[in-house]
Structure formats: C-alpha cells, structure tokens
C-alpha cells in the first residue's frame, strides 16, 4: 500500500558518508570503450537529439562499466557498457519521463518478444527493441544458455517493474517501505547487470551455485546497497521530478515522518548494514571452493565500489547539485 500525501522539508541537505570496504579499480580499456559505447548509442537512435547526445557524452558512461567490471576483456566490457547505456536510455525515455503506466505497458510486447525469441510476424522496428535484440545476440555468443536465460528472466522483471513505478507517478502515490524495498530490487535493474558478471569474468556459475542460499543473500544485499546509494546520490536529480515518490528518501520521510536529512542518515545506516551482511556471508561462499562463485562475489563488490566512485563524479548526478539547492557531499 502507499499514500498520496506529501511533506515540505528543511534545507540544505548533506549526503551521509558512503564507506566502502571493497577494492576500487578501473578497466584498462576504459577510454576506448567509453568512445565505442557512445558511438553505438548514437547509431541505435535511442537518443532523440544532439543535446541529449552531448549530455550522454559528458556523463562518460563507459567509466561506470570500467569501474564495475574492471576485470572484463575488451569485448565483454563493450557488452556490459552497451547494456548499461541501454538501461540509462530506457530509464530516461520511459521511467524519468511523464509517460503513463499504460504507455509503458504497451511498449512491453515487442521487448518481451525479443527476449523470448518469439516471431512477432513483422520486423522489429522499435529502436529499444532493436538494440535489445543486438545485445541479446552478444550475450548468447559470449555466454551459455543458462547465462542467457538468467539475464532475460531478470530483464523481463525489470521491464514489468517500470509499470509499477509509472503507476505510482500517475496516481501520486508514495509506496510503503515494504513495497518499495521489494520493488526497488527490480526497478533498479541491478539483477540484470549482476547476471552478466559471470559472462564478463569468463567463469560460468552452475545452476546450483546461482541458487545457493548464500549467493541469493549476498546478491540481495549488494542489490540493496547499490540502489539505496543511487537513491541518495540521485536525489537532487529526482527530487523535483514526477519520479521523486519512487525514491527511498521520500518513502522514509512520508511513512516515518522524517525530515529529508533524517531519511538520508537512516539510508546511510541501512546500506552500511547491508554491506556488513555481505562481509558476513562471504566466508561461507569461499568455503564452496568455486572460482566462479568467488569471481561473482568480487564482481558484486566491484559494483558497490565502482558505482559510488562513478556516481560521485558523473555529470548525470553532479549537475543537479549545481543547479538546485539540493544535497551536497559531506
């Protein structure tokens, strides 16, 4: 359940500290892939105009993939980098916009048909579906059937979750904390990028390893950390938009009657506990003696360190702090 009431809050705001015990590295192919990914994105026609292209150029999204997959070879770094910008482009076009839930729902059939290898009886003409088809082909080429199935299943969950977000925007609903945490694990698309960790590392997880309780637990904690960090860092960008209700800061402020600053501090404590949970479960996964499992765990850790390192320097988020009286970095 949710609520439609709103509050006004005190200013200015400060981000809480975002400590990270995990290593931070940059892939040596970063500059090359950043350039290639932007060219791929322009060719895809997912961006509407030159101004948007320039905004993406300045954001340097190749640096996000280079920080979160520092171990990847050039071809797999290109794959994950292109997938990340597909997600950003889709997010900007459908999720950060004023599109209604019904509009997003009507866009799903062609995307689902691509993911499911269905013959829709006509050529794929939607630019997002065409780019999705191309990315899926590369995942199939670089990974195995099990890896492809994992990725497309969580991608379908991500796409459907956008309808839920849009419905919240449309009805001006602030979701309950329980609903928000559950759905944020899907709306944030993190499971789609986590599903490519073993493709990028070249160490394929078995089905039993993927379903191991410890793997599920550490994946859920890592997911929470990254999306909650994003809710904090992106708050200036989102606070004046229609999507501001789909942010943990406003969810806590609404349902626990916190100030926005108190909500940010609470999120800082929540994400620190989730990191502690990851550290606690790691020894049991190391005991499995699987190189693939350890590579996956390291991949999760790089996602936490890399996403923070990227986001605190990216124009996608920092520009909003400069143009609005919103959070500053402590």
Curated annotation (Swiss-Prot):
The keyword Nucleotidyltransferase does not apply. Mg(2+) 3 binds at residues 230, 234, 238. The record marks 188 as: Plays a critical role for abstraction of the pyrophosphate group. The record marks 88 as: Plays a critical role in the stabilization of intermediate cation. Its cofactor is Mg(2+). Disulfide bonds: none annotated. Its EC number is 4.2.3.170. A motif (DDXXXE motif) lies at residues 91-96. Keywords: Lyase, Magnesium, Metal-binding. The keyword Lyase applies. It is an enzyme of class 4 (lyase). The Asp-Asp-Xaa-Xaa-Xaa-Glu (DDXXXE) motif is important for the catalytic activity, presumably through binding to Mg(2+). Belongs to the terpene synthase family. It comes from the Bacteria. Mg(2+) 2 binds at residue 96. It comes from Streptosporangium roseum (strain ATCC 12428 / DSM 43021 / JCM 3005 / KCTC 9067 / NCIMB 10171 / NRRL 2505 / NI 9100). Pathway: Secondary metabolite biosynthesis; terpenoid biosynthesis. Mg(2+) 1 binds at residues 91, 96. The record marks 92, 165 as: Plays a critical role for substrate recognition. Binds 3 Mg(2+) ions per subunit. Gene3D superfamilies: Farnesyl Diphosphate Synthase (1.10.600.10). PANTHER family: BETA-PINACENE SYNTHASE-RELATED, TERPENE SYNTHASE. This is 4-epi-cubebol synthase ((2E,6E)-farnesyl diphosphate cyclizing). GO terms for molecular function: metal ion binding; terpene synthase activity. GO terms for biological process: terpenoid biosynthetic process.
């Amino acid at each position: 359940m949710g609520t439609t009431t709103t509050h006004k809050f005190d200013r200015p705001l400060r981000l809480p500290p975002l400590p990270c015990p995990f290593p931070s590295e940059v892939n040596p192919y970063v500059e090359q892939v950043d350039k290639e990914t932007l060219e791929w994105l322009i060719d895809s026609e997912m961006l509407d105009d030159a101004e948007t292209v320039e905004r993406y150029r300045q954001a340097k999204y190749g640096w996000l993939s280079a920080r979160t997959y520092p171990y990847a070879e050039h071809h797999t770094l290109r794959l994950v980098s292109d997938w990340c910008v597909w997600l950003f482009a889709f997010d900007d076009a459908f999720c950060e916009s004023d599109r209604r839930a019904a509009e997003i729902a009507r866009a799903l059939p062609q995307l689902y048909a691509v993911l499911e290898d269905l013959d829709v009886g006509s050529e794929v003409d939607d630019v997002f579906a065409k780019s999705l088809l191309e990315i899926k082909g590369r995942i199939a080429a670089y990974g195995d059937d099990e890896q492809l199935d994992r990725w497309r299943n969580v991608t379908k969950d991500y796409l459907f979750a956008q309808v839920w977000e849009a419905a919240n925007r449309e009805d001006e609903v602030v979701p309950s904390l329980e609903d928000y945490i559950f759905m944020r694990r899907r709306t944030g698309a993190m499971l789609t990028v986590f599903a490519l960790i073993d493709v990028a590392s070249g160490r394929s997880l078995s089905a039993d390893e993927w379903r191991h309780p410890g793997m599920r637990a550490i994946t859920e904690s890592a997911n929470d950390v990254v999306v909650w960090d994003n809710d904090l860092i992106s708050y200036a960008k989102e606070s004046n938009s229609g999507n501001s209700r789909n942010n943990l800061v406003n969810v806590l402020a609404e349902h626990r009657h916190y100030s926005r600053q108190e909500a940010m501090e609470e999120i800082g404590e929540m994400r620190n506990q989730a990191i502690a949970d990851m550290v606690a479960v790691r020894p049991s996964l190391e005991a499995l003696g699987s190189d693939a499992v350890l590579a996956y765990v390291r991949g999760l850790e790089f996602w936490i360190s890399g996403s923070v390192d990227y986001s605190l320097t990216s124009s996608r988020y920092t520009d909003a702090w400069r143009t609005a009286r919103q959070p500053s970095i402590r």
